[in-house]
Amino acid sequence: MKIKNFIYFLIYFIFLFKVINGQNKTCKISVLLSGDKSDLGYNYMMNEARVLAESQLHMYPFSIYYEHLEESTLEAEHAIQDSVDKGANLIVVSSVIHFSLGVKYATKYKDEPIYWIIRGSKLVPTLPKVVILNFNSFELHYLLGYYAGLATKTGVVGFVSPGIGINTLSCDNSFYIGAKYARSNITFLDIHTGSWYNPEVSYKAAQKLIENGADVIGMSQDDMSVQKAIMDSGGLGLGVTGYPGHYQFGSDVAYSYLTNWTNLFITYANHVINDDWPAFDSFFTNLSRKDAIFMDDFSFRVPIDIQTKTKIELENLMNTSYAPYKSDPILESIGLQFSGNWINDTQFRANTKILPSYGDSTVDYPESLKIGVTVVSGFCIFLCLISMIIVIKFKEAKVIKSSSPIFCLLILFGCIVIFVGCIMFARSPTDGSCRSRVWLLSLGYTIFLGNLMVKNWRIWLLFDNPKLKKRAITNWKLYPWVSGIVIIDIVILSIWQALGDIVAESRTGIDSLTKYEYRNVCASSDQGSIALYLLLVFHGLILLVACFISFKIKVVDIEEFNESKPITTSVYIITFCLFIVIPIMVSSPTVTTQTTIICICALITTMLSIILLFGTKFFKMITVGLELGQTFVTSTKSSSHSQRTKSSKSSNGSGPKINGFGGNVLNLDDDSDEISSEKEKKKPIESNPKDHMAVFTSDEETSKASKFSSEQFSREQINDNIILENNNDNEEKQKDEEEIKEEKLLVSEIQAKRLSLEQNGQTEIDSNDV
């Protein structure tokens, strides 16, 4: 019996303790506001809920609030920490821009008796003391857009929003779809302010839309500044902040949605007091629930027929299965995918693209920049096309043939791509142009420098050949190298595009613009910037290799093949401009200046390179002549020739000196009989050890020539033209002279084939131990 009484007493004591403890437990609310508490908008309604909840629950100590927290993340962090220090145990993070910050501090104090209401769109499964606050703002903007489509007299409606980086564009698109449902031929203008709360900028943004014909304007700003602009112009405003606009503006506000967060605050404050907080909860509301969001009455200035049609659409929205703002097929045009009858909710909320047929009131690049770059680039493209025609028409000319016509055409094609990229750089930025202009410039320079580098790499290999090894380096053997360089460039560009999130976005406060002016600029993520720097390193390596090859071909003693000077000059100019462009990209000056310098550098480097590489060749064709089918003569002694001469002397001992080709031409083209005069045919062919000779033939002869050995190459032709100075009857001396003559033929043939048939890429050097 005593034990039973003791148990009853214990239970009673625990109950009494809990009751007393519950009566002593209090709730202290702290509200974080993004803007001004008196903005007569979203922040006003949130602060009003705090005041009413405090009054109805007789809260003591009093609740607290912090405002203007959008201006500084540090201020927002200080506000949360200060709330904790002052004993707040229900902290309301009212703005979606502070969602991550709220989660951070909720995680930090998850073991403390502190509860959170955070505005956001997704639950946090690791934080049971956090309630996510959200409401369907898309249906509200759709309904107001529907009214706007009915009410507009100009057929033009507008929308003002913070823009990408602050919020998605789903509200903008919902307003537009609503207007389109009411009036199919609607014109939609959209403008971004870069902030939830900046009354001065918002007012001027609305004025710009009005100047472009908009007479009804929606918005997702936290204050009524946009609607003030439309009312000041004589139009009817919309209540788009949750505040009853007619309280202040009377009948000038045509239609409004209203919010009341008092019940939300009271409900969760009671959970704190009663210690029965619902873990992992969320508070999502919409028009159909009628617990926090409502539609206000129409102004008497709104025609009855418009009121009636809008009310019918409101009744349709009460059915949650009706959601045209995320089921219209036009949403597929911006890459959103349907999941059943609707767009996937996650994609819809995260969308950052505006629907087609919209306008932006922005400050564009100067027309002088656009026209100047376009005209100069167009002229340069014309010169490149003319140069390509000349190369094709006179590909048999000595100076063109020595430069590999096919690679000359590829180099000119790369230059054309660069000039097209310059034109794209001077255009108004869009998502497509932001990507394409970098692709065009990068691929253009890769094609230009890659072909130039590979073409001269072949020259280096052929002339840096002291042992006269047989080397057949055709164009088909060079194409994979060029393709490999281009593929590397494409891979880096693909990584940049995949990771960079490259988009065109509107920005304020740049290029010395006033706070009322906006400009579209290209933007990318940090990963995109890293890939872009990797691309610059890749092009820097190409320039270094090109410099190295141009240095190595300085030893080439045939003028037509030695392009070291123009290549070195071109590479120097490009490198110099690159060292100008990189600091500009890092320091980020005004966008207009940046674009201008990049275009000028690209135009100058490319045009000067064309003049250096092709202008000199065309000038020589005019002054010297085409020299069709002629061989290439040098009057300098190369290192490989010196070694061959020494080898010849050591094998011949003190034998007679070999007289060779001199400056005469050995022409193996199809038209050799027509080009060479009879006198030249009968002239003995002499060989001078100081001279080298090269010959180019047609494509057919290229394939045929490779089948013959050097001994069959021109033995009969040379034997018929050699005049022996001494004809000794002594059989032994005659035998020695025959051996010397044979040695002479071998040396001459090797020299004659020092360079071979490059028109079709066939290059062959026969190796004979002379």
Curated annotation (Swiss-Prot):
Disulfide bonds: none
Up-regulation conditions: Down-regulated by Pseudomonas aeruginosa, PAO1 strain and PA14 strain infection.
Membrane association type: Multi-pass membrane protein
Entry GO MF terms: G protein-coupled receptor activity
Compositional bias segments (type: Basic and acidic residues): 676-693, 730-740
Topological domains annotated Extracellular: 23-370, 427-442, 505-528, 587-594
Superkingdom field: Eukaryota
Annotated region (Disordered), positions in chain: 639-740
BP GO terms, sorted: G protein-coupled receptor signaling pathway
Chain ranges on the Cytoplasmic side, renumbered to this chain: 392-405, 464-483, 550-565, 616-770
Glycosylated residue positions: N24, N185, N260, N286, N319, N344
Keywords from the UniProt entry: Coiled coil, G-protein coupled receptor, Glycoprotein, Membrane, Receptor, Signal, Transducer, Transmembrane, Transmembrane helix
Keyword Magnesium: no
Keyword RNA-binding: no
Subcellular location(s) per record: Membrane
Coiled-coil ranges per UniProt: 715-760
Transmembrane segments: 371-391, 406-426, 443-463, 484-504, 529-549, 566-586, 595-615
Signal peptide (from-to): 1-22
One term under GO cellular component: plasma membrane
Family membership noted in the UniProt record: In the N-terminal section; belongs to the BMP lipoprotein family.
Name this polypeptide is given: Metabotropic glutamate receptor-like protein F
Record gene name: grlF
